[in-house]
């Protein structure tokens, strides 16, 4: 091996996790190396050409609030934007951007190449270097050696990956890229537990071969949206999407050929995602449904490739063509890329601390799909956490761990390191018990102060945040202090808006709480002053959902007591009496950092936690006596 260079941080893999990890470490002052199998692969979108959606948009907003890049990149390369779940409450509003995949890759590669302290190199990593029980670098297939104080694995779906299409199986990565061969075996050699998962992607079809008039048009929102608090809210709609459906003919062809599907023929052994099933799985599992919706989405501005969302499959090519041509608008379809399944290795995330550092190998971190998640947003969020914590550890500072009540990112990481992943993990709003206070609209109010305190949020972004916070506080101050008396002109205005007149002096916030009332109506009819649009949106939600928010905040205070009760890192769980064997074994493996985390481990009962609390108090008493 030939020593090429020495860094503070080395990031293996330049997908969505790797880019955020490398950018975070470099921006926090660490000399960083980002490696990739191909420079043409940086921040590639191997599956859907989109960012955001239910649960995921919250992650993107939080990444942005902490100083990450994904939100800005998504805004810069969007070809359509829509706010989903508008018929539900604001806790589950979800912004989704249709992305230009090529532009997204180019944008992120340019950011990486122009970031101080950051080198980007095309290498195939074969081994991690371990000395004295610590990870201290990497070796490449060309016998190059790079040393570092921390290594972050962001290998995505590339570890010993296998492409599967019908009877055809071959070693390969997504979209015809090379797989990462050798690194998985090396990780096993160092005592790490490896799982194997499966995911899939639909075919890409030629737009020119489609009859779009036979489908339902899906346009972007007329309102202006943005993921990043640094981006201008403007019209980003440049392309349309379309909606169509499968039918009984489609399903009949799939049923007739079901034993040619690799999963049903016993050729796929990796565990697939429950929330993103293949079309053959949908037909089998939901036999009562006579159709399934398909969204036809552009891959970019300068390509005719269209992504068929909802049609993931690993069926043989002839079967793919047969069922595609039964779909309205697809009668003459031409495939440009076939659908496929991909199997890949990953680390069991139960081997990680909440900092995403590997428990058994200090100095080694893991983030993204190599931890068992699915999706670009989940990967990017983990990359950010790993990059931040690697930098903080090198700088001798306290770790950065977001609690479940502070961010969706906190729930994501906690679920992974506490409960593990028995299938590709997908973030959903239902995974957070605090979703009413963890909305996408208040991500910066929750997290930007934290990002600034660790040195990731720059002064320009922080100044904008302070200005936005000031505008919100001004709006809140007005709505809390302004009162209206039951004057004739006031009551006439209220009645004209379809709401009850006043009988006594009433606070503006109480009027705003009325279901039929908005602040824009109060401006128009009651002469209320104008405030910043985003501040008004935030203020309305705060006021209208005040009671629910107060209840969640009370639950947060209760949970915080358990989270603040820290567990010693050297606790000998196996020697504790009065705790079930299963609980002792799981806590010994997971090494929870707090009583709160220990209580969330599957198999650890409330009785086990009660006994553990006694041990912790006894230990504190002994230390105090010393």
Residue ranges and their predicted role:
Residues 3-17:
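Beta1/beta-strand and adjacent pyrophosphate-binding region of the FAD-binding site
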Residues 5-7, 141-150:
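Core beta-strand elements of the Rossmann-like FAD/NAD(P) dinucleotide-binding domain
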Residues 12, 145-156:
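Short hydrophobic core segments
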Residues 23-131, 142, 154-171, 178, ...:
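Conserved N-terminal/central alpha/beta ligand/cofactor-binding core
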Residues 38-40, 83, 184-321, 418-491, ...:
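An anion/pyrophosphate-binding glycine-rich loop and adjacent beta-alpha core
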Residues 307-373, 401-414, 532-586, 591:
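A glycine-rich dinucleotide-binding beta-alpha-beta segment and adjacent secondary-structure elements
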Residues 379-400:
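Internal hydrophobic alpha-helix adjacent to the cofactor/substrate pocket in enzyme cavities
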Residues 431, 437, 448-608, 614-626:
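Extended, charge-enriched "interface" segments that sit outside catalytic cores
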């Amino acid at each position: 091996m030939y020593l090429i260079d020495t860094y503070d941080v080395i990031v293996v893999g330049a997908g969505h996790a790797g880019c955020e990890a490398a950018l975070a470490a470099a921006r926090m002052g660490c000399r960083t190396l980002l490696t990739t199998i191909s420079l043409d692969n940086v921040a590639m979108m191997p599956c859907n050409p989109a960012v955001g959606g239910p649960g995921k948009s919250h992650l993107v907003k939080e990444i942005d609030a902490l100083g990450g890049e994904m939100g800005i990149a998504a805004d810069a390369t969007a070809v359509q934007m829509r706010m989903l779940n508008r018929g539900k409450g604001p806790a589950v509003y979800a912004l989704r951007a249709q992305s230009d995949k090529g532009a997204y890759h180019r944008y992120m590669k340019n950011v990486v190449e122009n970031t101080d302290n950051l080198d980007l190199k095309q290498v195939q990593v074969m081994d991690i270097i371990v000395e004295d029980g610590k990870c201290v670098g990497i070796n490449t297939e060309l016998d190059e050696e790079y040393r570092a104080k921390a290594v972050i694995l962001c290998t995505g779906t590339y570890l010993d990956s296998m492409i599967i299409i019908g009877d055809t199986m071959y070693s390969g990565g997504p979209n015809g890229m090379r797989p990462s061969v050798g690194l998985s075996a090396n990780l096993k050699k160092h005592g790490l537990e490896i799982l194997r998962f499966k995911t899939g992607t639909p075919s890409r079809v030629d737009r020119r071969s489609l009859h779009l008039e036979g489908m339902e048009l899906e346009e972007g929102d007329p309102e202006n949206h943005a993921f990043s608090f640094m981006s201008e809210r403007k019209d980003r709609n440049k392309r349309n999407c379309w909606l169509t459906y499968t039918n009984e003919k489609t399903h009949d062809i799939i049923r007739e050929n079901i034993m040619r599907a690799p999963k049903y023929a016993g050729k796929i052994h990796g565990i697939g995602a429950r929330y993103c099933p293949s079309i053959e799985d949908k037909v089998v599992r939901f036999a009562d449904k006579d159709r399934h919706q398909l969204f036809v989405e552009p891959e970019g501005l300068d390509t005719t490739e269209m992504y068929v969302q909802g049609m993931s499959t690993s069926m043989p090519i002839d079967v793919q063509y047969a069922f595609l041509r039964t779909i309205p608008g697809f009668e003459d379809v031409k495939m440009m890329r076939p659908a496929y399944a991909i199997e890949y290795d990953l680390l069991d995330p139960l081997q990680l601390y909440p900092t995403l550092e590997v428990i058994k190998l200090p100095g080694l971190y893991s983030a993204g799909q190599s931890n068992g998640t699915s999706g670009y947003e989940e990967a990017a969020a983990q990359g950010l956490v790993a990059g931040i914590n690697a930098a903080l550890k090198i700088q001798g500072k306290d770790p950065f761990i977001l609690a479940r009540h502070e961010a969706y990112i906190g729930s994501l990481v906690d679920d992974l390191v506490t409960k593990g992943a028995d299938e590709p993990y997908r973030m959903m709003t239902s995974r957070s018990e605090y979703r009413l206070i963890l909305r996408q609209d208040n991500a910066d109010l929750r997290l930007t102060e934290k990002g600034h305190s660790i040195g990731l949020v720059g002064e320009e972004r922080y100044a904008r945040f302070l200005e936005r916070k000031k505008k919100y506080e001004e709006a809140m101050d007005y709505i809390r202090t302004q009162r209206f008396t039951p004057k004739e002109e006031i009551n006439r205005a209220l009645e004209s808006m379809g709401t009850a007149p006043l009988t006594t002096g009433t606070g503006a916030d109480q009027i705003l709480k009325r279901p039929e009332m908005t602040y824009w109506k109060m401006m128009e009819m009651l002469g209320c002053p104008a405030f910043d649009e985003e501040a008004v949106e935030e203020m309305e939600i705060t006021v209208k959902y005040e009671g629910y928010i107060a209840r969640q905040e009370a639950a947060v205070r209760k949970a915080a007591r358990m989270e603040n009760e820290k567990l010693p890192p050297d606790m000998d769980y196996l020697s504790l009496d009065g705790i079930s064997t299963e609980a002792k074994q799981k806590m010994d493996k997971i090494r929870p950092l707090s009583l709160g985390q220990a209580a969330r481990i599957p198999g650890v009962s409330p009785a086990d936690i009660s006994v553990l609390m006694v041990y912790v108090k006894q230990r504190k008493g002994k230390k105090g006596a010393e």
